[in-house]
């Protein structure tokens, strides 16, 4: 191989920025939004309206940082598998454009930033953050040992909920745990849609997922999980006496779920991926319903 072709395969300097953006998924924000929406639900509900600006900023930045950290550790865990999966074979760690050492240093740096942010809240929230770190660090390895890595991901994507309540109210009431359970169910549903994209490749390399476990019952299980999500969110709405806008948002989420089932009915890869991406709007409409229900002028 010539020196020129080697340099093209392994760029240096600023030419490496796109690889680090891909590693942290900053070029594909869907995962960040799926983590952001339930965190915003919790912040608004805990504050009974618009949260204090500093707290909001801490959690918004924290979502970006921890999502990036989670992607780094995910690709590190999958570095020997990604090359065998069509969708992931060009990831920077799988191709060697980013080294394992660089990934470890980046992960540590992102965790330090996140810890610095949470230290601006209060001690109970700081203590809760250790569970968030444990979930983020262990999730990527679960797919080797269990068919339920999506449940661990759901817990990781939901842990901002009790942290938000603790930061604002210094307690984690029942409503927070119901919201967490709803978000876990929703996460397992949409990540099963995501896993349906890779199911054939995962079966070849021995990766486990709910999509592999559910098999031909995948659409039924996704529907049941989505129904559970709606029921748990409705329970939260009833307990907190949320107004009509919340129920409109919940109805819109239900309509979005119906649309997703039209997309995945033939289990085509592209359509399953579109259904996964569509969950951004599901989170948005629920947030809009909560925010408008708690808006003081409405």
UniProtKB/Swiss-Prot annotation:
Tell me the superkingdom of the source: Bacteria
Q: What class of enzyme is it?
A: transferase
Q: For this UniProt entry, what is the primary localization, expressed as one broad class? A: membrane
The record's family statement is:
Belongs to the UbiA prenyltransferase family.
- Coiled-coil regions in this chain? none
Q: Where are the transmembrane segments?
A: 30-50, 54-74, 105-125, 148-168, 218-238, 240-260, 275-295
Q: Which UniProt keywords apply?
A: Cell inner membrane, Cell membrane, Magnesium, Membrane, Transferase, Transmembrane, Transmembrane helix, Ubiquinone biosynthesis
Q: What is this protein called?
A: 4-hydroxybenzoate octaprenyltransferase
In its UniProt entry, the species of origin is given as: Chromohalobacter salexigens (strain ATCC BAA-138 / DSM 3043 / CIP 106854 / NCIMB 13768 / 1H11)
For molecular function, the Gene Ontology terms on record are: 4-hydroxybenzoate polyprenyltransferase activity
Q: Which NCBIfam families match?
A: ubiA_proteo
Q: Does the keyword Transferase apply?
A: yes
Query: Matching PANTHER family, A to Z?
Result: 4-HYDROXYBENZOATE POLYPRENYLTRANSFERASE, MITOCHONDRIAL, PRENYLTRANSFERASES
GO biological process annotations for this chain's record? ubiquinone biosynthetic process
Q: What is its EC number?
A: 2.5.1.39
């Amino acid at each position: 191989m010539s020196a020129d072709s080697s340099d093209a395969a392994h760029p240096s300097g600023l030419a490496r920025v796109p690889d680090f953006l891909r590693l942290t998924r900053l070029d594909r924000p869907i995962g960040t939004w799926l983590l952001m929406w339930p965190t915003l639900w919790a912040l608004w509900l805990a504050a009974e309206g618009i949260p204090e600006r500093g707290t909001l900023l801490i959690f918004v930045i924290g979502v970006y940082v921890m999502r990036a950290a989670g992607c780094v550790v995910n690709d590190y865990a999958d570095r020997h598998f990604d090359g065998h999966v069509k969708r992931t074979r060009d990831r920077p760690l799988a191709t060697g454009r980013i080294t394992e050492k660089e990934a470890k240093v980046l992960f540590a740096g992102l965790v330090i930033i996140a810890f610095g942010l949470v230290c601006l809240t209060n001690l109970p929230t700081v203590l809760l953050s250790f569970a968030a770190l444990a979930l983020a660090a262990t999730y990527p390895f679960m797919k080797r040992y269990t068919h339920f890595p999506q449940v661990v991901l759901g817990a990781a994507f939901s842990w901002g909920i009790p942290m938000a309540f603790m930061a604002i109210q210094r307690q984690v009431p029942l409503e927070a745990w119901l919201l967490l359970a709803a978000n876990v169910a929703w996460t397992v549903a949409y990540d099963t849609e995501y896993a349906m994209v890779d199911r054939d490749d995962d079966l070849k390399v021995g990766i486990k997922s709910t999509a592999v476990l559910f098999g031909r019952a995948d659409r039924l299980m996704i529907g049941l999980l989505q129904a559970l999500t709606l029921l748990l969110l409705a329970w939260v709405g009833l307990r907190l006496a949320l107004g009509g806008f919340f129920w409109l948002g919940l109805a819109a989420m239900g309509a979005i779920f119906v649309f997703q089932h039209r997309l995945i009915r033939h289990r085509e890869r592209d359509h399953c991926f579109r259904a996964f991406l569509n969950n951004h709007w599901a989170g948005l409409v629920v947030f809009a319903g909560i925010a408008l229900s708690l808006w003081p002028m409405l």
